[in-house]
């Protein structure tokens, strides 16, 4: 990545919809020159261009979950179990006592609480020794997060984590809106 690439990336961070002409004007390149550079950065895995959502505008709640998982095998199974969870935004392995951090969202406080305690929670995963659950108050610098709406298909009988919402007491008692990947989902996604 050189200085031209950095300028292009900086402009795309300001406005991901900037045209190749606008980018070219900033860096002094033609439309085709900028297009080639952007495509090369995308195909090389350096950048991606996608929509992010202001979760605060939707009144969603973000949470940071720290987990200590007993083994690499259990960690791999946990990563696989939640790979297609629409509420999990990011999972980070850590080099610390807690060896996994998860950034997730919930549609409301009750669902957030269920997300921390029910069968579909990260805490309930086999091999988890301990967890810490930190609801996030404010998101600073940019409120936009990459919510995985493409996973909120509302068409499955069973959630990606292999839990059935329709048999869950929290779902039945309307304390949880259900998984956005299932046909039982009652939320806004």
Predicted segments — roles?
Residues 1-189:
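A compositional/biophysical signature of low hydrophobicity enriched in polar/charged and small residues
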């Amino acid at each position: 990545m050189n200085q031209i690439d950095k300028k292009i990336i900086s402009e795309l961070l300001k406005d991901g919809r900037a045209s190749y002409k606008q980018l070219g004007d900033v860096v002094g390149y033609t439309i085709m020159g900028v297009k080639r550079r952007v495509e090369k950065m995308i195909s090389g895995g350096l950048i991606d261009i996608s929509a992010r959502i202001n979760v605060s505008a939707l009144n969603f709640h973000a949470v940071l979950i720290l987990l200590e998982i007993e083994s690499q095998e259990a960690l791999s199974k946990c990563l696989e179990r939640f790979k297609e969870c629409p509420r999990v935004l990011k999972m980070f392995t850590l080099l610390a006592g807690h060896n996994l951090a998860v950034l997730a969202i919930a549609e409301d406080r009750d669902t957030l609480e269920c997300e921390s305690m029910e069968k579909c929670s990260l805490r309930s995963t086999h091999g988890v020794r301990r967890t810490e659950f930190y609801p996030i108050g404010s998101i600073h610098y940019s409120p936009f997060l990459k919510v995985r709406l493409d996973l909120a298909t509302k068409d499955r009988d069973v959630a990606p984590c292999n839990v059935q919402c329709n048999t869950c007491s929290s779902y039945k008692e309307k304390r949880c809106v259900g998984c956005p990947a299932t046909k039982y989902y009652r939320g806004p996604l």
